[in-house]
Each structure stands twice: as structure tokens, then as C-alpha cells.
Amino acid sequence: LPGVQDPTAAKKIIGKTANLEFRMEANARTSPLRKEEFNFKENDFQTAYLEKAVIVSGDRVTNASTGFDESGFAQVNITLDMQGGRAMQKATSGNIGRRLGVLFVEQKTKSELVTNSLGESVIEQTTYIEKNIISLATVQAVLGTSFRITGVGTPAEASELALLLRAGALAAPMKFVEERTVGPSL
């Protein structure tokens, strides 16, 4: 993990499986069967409806880096592969003026203390998928292979998101079996 020196931070990143989904915001004419309601990542009380159809997912992301927009706020610069760029171009060319949602998809694990059949207390871990909106912005131009996501919070949060997206090429979750610290020696 380039730029990560702290083993705890590296474990946190490797243990997460993050992805993105780009979807158009549902409008009043969208059938209830073709839309889903999601919370915003930064505000659980704010929700929006997005179409169920995924335009592009994070597996099409070839690069993600951080930067700052014209107002000095953090942003994540995204580069898609050619297939992802074509899909994004097709979806946005007919939807200028509509809002495009960016969902942050994260696989999480929750631990729960349960009693097994022998009457013993054991910790049971359950994996679940959490999807939250990180951006819902108006499409102002046709998007292609390169664009940016704004409204991602602090520079540190933008940096973590970009790192997770680059590391998100890991299509399956990782579990730690063994941990060692290796350092340089003579």
C-alpha cells in the first residue's frame, strides 16, 4: 500500500472491501420497482432515491487520486477504463441537468455475543453490505473516462476514499490469518 507506513492503518485498509456504484437519481416518473432509497454517508437522516440500474461500478476504476476543487474543497479524481468511460458517456449524454449519485459500497462485519447449543457464549461474526451516498451532483456535461467526485469531506477522507478505490481492485474480502512485521536488516 503506497504511502501507508502504519501497520494498523494498513490492516484497516486491507480489511475493508470498498467499491463504488454510479447511478442516476430516480425521478417522479421512476417506477417504485426500479428505485432504491439510500442514506447519505455524512448524514444518516438525509436520504435520496437512486435508480436500481448501475451505470458503472468501481471495478472500472483504473486510478483514483485526491485534489482540490476551485473552492479549495477536497475531491477525488477518477479515471475509468474504456468500457466504463463509454458507459458513463452514454448515461450522462442524455441526462444533462439530472443528478448522478455515487454510492460508497462497503463490506462490513459485525460481531455479536450469542449462546451456542452447548450453552456457551461465543462471538458470532456476520458480514453485510452497506451502501451510502457520498455524492449526488448535477450532471453539467457529458462524462467520459476522467472526472471528479466532489463533496467527499475532509482531505483525509478524500485520501482514504482514493486509497480504498485503488485497493478496491481486491474483488473479495480479506481475512487475516497471520500477521508479521518485517523490517530491513543487514
Task: Name each model feature, range by range.
Residues 1-138, 147:
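Non-transmembrane, solvent-exposed regions of membrane trafficking/translocation machinery
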